[in-house]
Amino acid sequence: MPSRAALKAELLELLGVHLETLERAHRAVCEGATHEEAKPENDKDTRALEQSYLARGQAARIDELRASIAGVAALALRSFEDRPIALGALVVLDEDGAESTLLLAPGGGGARLADGRVQVVTPPSPLGRALLGKQAGEQVEMVVAGKTRTMTVLRIG
């Protein structure tokens, strides 16, 4: 099992790269919205308005991403020996004989770390909600597309 400190560092790097990319795209959209060519040619021309909507949406996503980075950076990597699953836990699940490893983090949900061997889940996600408070040996159930999935918590690190 990879170390949680290494996974945290990898997640922070991944989120940082994503933030830089989004900030570059946001700057380009803002420049496009205020560029001379974006001025409406008639009352039906909405290029500048569309660019401003896109810029506003990107700005909101940038704020969310910065909050995720701050949450992950502040994540305490405490011991989970004989403790229930909480933020910062590295969890190994078994579902029908197939093992999966998850990192419960405050941001970066869906990211794959350690060459794809570890998936990041967040507390608001269905799986994150189902995992919170569980102990090793307990079963986790969640409904996906009308079908119940049952997993067993093998280890918490």
Task: Enumerate the language-model features and the residues they cover.
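Short hydrophobic/aromatic patches at helix-to-coil boundaries
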Residues: 153-157
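Non-DNA-binding regulatory cores of transcription-related proteins
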Residues: 79-147, 151
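Helix-adjacent hinge/juxtasegments
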Residues: 66-67, 71-85
